[in-house]
A protein has these predicted regions:
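Extracellular/oxidizing-compartment recognition motifs
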Residues: 1-381, 393, 409-410, 429-433, ...
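Active/binding-pocket-proximal capping segment
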Residues: 34, 43-45, 418-419, 470-473, ...
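Active-site acid/base region of carbohydrate-active enzymes
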Residues: 103-127, 321, 329-366, 372, ...
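Non-catalytic C-terminal accessory modules of carbohydrate-active enzymes
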Residues: 125-152, 221-222, 279-280, 548, ...
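C-terminal capping/lid segments that line or modulate ligand- or cofactor-binding pockets
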Residues: 134-147, 386, 404, 447, ...
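Alpha-helical support elements that line or immediately flank enzyme active sites
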Residues: 255-274, 314, 322-327, 391-421, ...
Length: 758
């Protein structure tokens, strides 16, 4: 089958076992994806998304589902073909199951397996009308014809005698190994062009039942909440057209599960959307559905008339609303059940924040929902439209993960993938995995900051050290573009920094034609962080060279781009544009003395003529706020998030209205800020070996929360006493010490509980 052809395949292997095994470990992978079953029960899905030269496999113990006698190991494998998601790499359609030891070798893929190409499936392309012309890079829809589907194919009682024997197309190889035992037609002399296999390094994705909250609207039929609760079937008469709008009550990711009986000749179409839109395509309040329609990606199911037929989408969909369009033929249709199987990376909400300002709790819930559904096998910018792991988004998402869940595995995955994405010149791709290469050089600088984030929060210098060659390559690449002025000259590729309204394509003045103060300062910011990484692993000379380069950029940018009359940095020396972004980076990169930074920050907040930071770049603005000692103004900067709640949003959007995406986890960063700035918990030294707690309560009278730490949990409870006093209860994990700061006073902290009064 050509590598760019859509196809769905079922594979089966029957095993006779003399007794139930204690252990039966296999390694399994596929291209593009698979679901694995043992005796009808799902035991694995994957593979973890990556690229062909780092192709992942899962390791699974099948023993719990095996028994004495006949057993069936079965898999569904699919290839999206030429309309694959942009994040999906592929070599060609394939499936591999390899025993861990000789005793399980009978399960190995080979001639003992039987295969069936399922003609029931077709892909449903997403059209411009479906997504209002927006950029779309995720999976297409699916159409499934129940009359052609091999019902029960995964069960032991299914007869597969008409299926064909599986041909061996290739031999797998681990990363670093070549095909020394090549399949027929392969050379076997250093050939590493196929799948280079690596073990999965993240846990299985969460999969759990999720039901709709309500039926919002019907036409052509009456429908109560009974059938979406699983308690009663919905009967649709013959020759009927009906439509039902269902609401999950929040944006979610889920595989659609539809169970039908009867209804031969019927068609059921599920359309998924984050919001209902009016006749002009406007979203409005996300709770409103009156006189609004739902457009988006859709799946189509054609029942064959059998009883209790269970359709499930191969891949998950994202959205809040699902519109169910039904057209029956000559026989009635029973919808026995319709629900979702929620899926996401299995983050656990260990961190928490509570205060005497109730709406902050609602914001926390909204942001955490967005962070959850923005994380699968990679971080994703938007689970609905793209499902791509961008560096700019991922840095913020990873900090949320560290502070709310304490789980760093998806962050490590991202750091590794971005390093894998580097081009020979040195910089990373903007996003990865991505079959379509995109280059945003400023994101390579954000990557340096992300590795520094990991270094400050995890005591793992060996891990960090392996990424220093890549960081050096990035900074060397940038060094080639610093011209005689000491600033960056004209820069290639897409120099996106922020979705600022007055920046074309998000690119600041001077980026393309030379002397961008914005990107020159971002480079200084990255060099400072790289210097810390180098110094902490003992590379002092390299660290000093980075500090020297950063100092040179700071001096050149201040000399050429500082406006002494307005006391602001221009976006470039030859530009009349002034932005929050450039001046925030001036603070974060120390482009002016510490004593002058607070006044600059106050001007940034007060001057309404500046190009404003977006939801994404407001993270950097809020970090600058904390840096200059204005953290007490943090909560007042969250007015846009309160506005999101008023719009009925259940996850933070990509940008202010009109927005394409209603779920963009880069805008969920205030959950990090509530813990790191308002509660005040930050690393005081690399590896989070010590902690600094410097709360900035602003208008709050009380706040309490928890931050997961590698050694345990950090618990903080704060209550104001009068105008300037504070009572604090702090509990640190064993082996962790630090300092607590309040109103100019600093006191030591030790492991365990301590009660402080200021």
């Amino acid at each position: 089958m050509p590598a760019d052809s859509f196809g769905v395949f079922h594979a089966r292997r029957t095993l006779d076992l003399p007794a139930k095994p204690d252990r039966f470990t296999v390694h399994v992978s596929a291209d593009n994806r698979y679901r694995l079953y043992v005796n009808g029960t799902q035991v694995s899905s994957g593979p973890q998304r990556s690229d062909v030269t780092h192709w992942r496999y899962e390791t699974v113990d099948l023993a719990p589902q095996l028994h004495a006698g006949a057993n069936v190991i079965a898999a569904v494998v699919w290839n999206w073909g030429r309309r694959h998601p942009v994040a999906q790499h592929s070599n060609r359609t394939g499936f591999l199951l390899q025993a861990d030891s000789p005793r399980e070798a009978a399960a190995n893929t080979g001639t003992g397996w039987r295969l069936y190409r399922d003609s029931a499936y077709a892909d449903l392309p997403v059209t411009n009308r479906d997504i209002s012309g927006a950029y779309y890079a995720a999976a297409q829809g699916e159409a499934v014809d129940g009359a052609r589907y091999p019902w029960g194919w995964e069960r032991t009682d299914f007869v597969d005698r008409d299926w064909f024997t599986v041909p061996v197309a290739d031999a797998g190889a681990n990363v670093g190994q070549v095909h020394l035992h090549a399949a027929p037609g392969r050379g076997g002399y250093g050939d590493a062009s196929g799948w280079q296999l690596e073990p999965r390094d993240i846990p299985p994705m969460e999969e759990s039942l999720v039901r709709f909250a309500s039926v919002r609207r019907t036409s052509g039929i009456a429908a109560s909440d009974g059938f979406i609760k699983g308690g009663a079937a919905l009967v649709v008469p013959a020759n009927t057209r009906a439509s039902i709008l269902l609401d999950y009550a929040k944006t979610t990711n889920a595989y659609a599960v539809l169970e039908t009986s009867g209804g031969a000749g019927s068609t059921i179409t599920l359309t998924y959307a984050e919001a209902a839109v009016d006749s002009a395509g406007r979203k409005g309040n996300r709770n409103d559905v009156d006189r609004r329609t739902v457009r988006g990606i859709h799946d189509r199911f054609l029942p064959d008339g059998g009883e209790r037929r269970r359709f499930q989408t191969l891949y998950w969909r994202s959205g809040r609303y699902v519109n169910v369009d039904i057209e029956t033929g000559a026989t009635p249709l029973r919808i026995e059940d319709l629900h979702g199987i929620f899926t996401a990376y299995p983050f656990v909400e260990r961190g928490r924040f509570a205060s005497d300002l109730p709406w902050l709790a609602d914001m926390w819930k909204m942001n955490w929902n967005g962070a959850r559904i923005g994380a699968f096998e990679t971080y994703m910018d938007t689970p609905y439209y793209e499902q791509l792991q961008y560096i700019g988004d991922t840095r913020l998402q990873a900090l949320i993960s560290l502070y709310v869940s304490g789980d760093d595995r998806l962050m490590r995955q991202a750091i590794t993938h971005f390093d894998d994405s580097r081009i020979p010149e040195g910089i990373t791709a903007s996003r990865y995995p991505s079959e379509l290469r995109q280059l945003i050089p400023p994101f390579s600088l954000v990557y340096v900051a992300m590795v520094h984030d990991y270094h400050m929060h995890r005591d793992d210098s060996r891990y960090v050290r392996q990424y220093l060659p890549g960081i050096r390559g990035i900074l060397d690449w940038y060094g080639r573009y610093v011209d005689s002025t000491g600033m960056l000259g004209p820069m290639p590729y897409w120099n996106f920094v922020d979705w600022a309204d007055r920046w074309q394509r998000g690119v600041p003045a001077g980026a393309d034609n030379g002397h961008s103060a914005t990107i020159s300062l971002l480079l200084a910011y990255a060099l400072d962080r790289a210097a810390v990484l180098e110094a902490d692993v003992g590379e002092r000379a390299m660290a000093q060279s980075y500090r020297t380069r950063a100092d040179s950029l700071r001096v050149a940018t201040r000399t050429r781009a500082w406006d002494p009359a307005r006391k602001l940095f221009r976006d470039s020396p030859d530009s009349a544009a002034y932005s929050q972004q450039t001046n925030v980076l001036a603070i974060l990169s120390n482009a002016l003395p510490q004593a002058e930074q607070r006044a600059l920050m106050e001007r940034v907040l007060a001057d309404s003529t500046l190009i404003p930071a977006s939801y994404y770049f407001s993270f950097y603005l809020l970090e600058a706020l904390e840096k200059v000692g204005l953290g007490d103004r943090y909560i007042e900067q969250l007015a846009p998030w309160r506005g999101m709640l008023a719009l009925g949003l259940t996850s933070a959007p990509e940008k202010p209205e009109p927005t394409r995406s209603d779920s963009h986890a880069w805008a969920a960063h205030p959950n990090y800020g509530l813990l790191a700035t308002v509660l005040g918990v930050r690393p005081a030294s690399r590896g989070f070996r010590t902690v600094r707690i410097a709360p900035k309560l602003g208008p709050l009278r009380s706040a309490e929360g928890r931050v997961p730490h590698p050694r345990g949990d950090i618990d903080v409870a704060l209550t104001r006493d009068g105008a300037n006093g504070l009572s604090a209860r702090v509990t640190l994990p064993a082996g962790v010490a630090g300092r607590f700061e309040w109103n100019g006073r600093s006191v030591p902290l030790h492991a365990g509980r301590q009660d402080l009064h200021f």
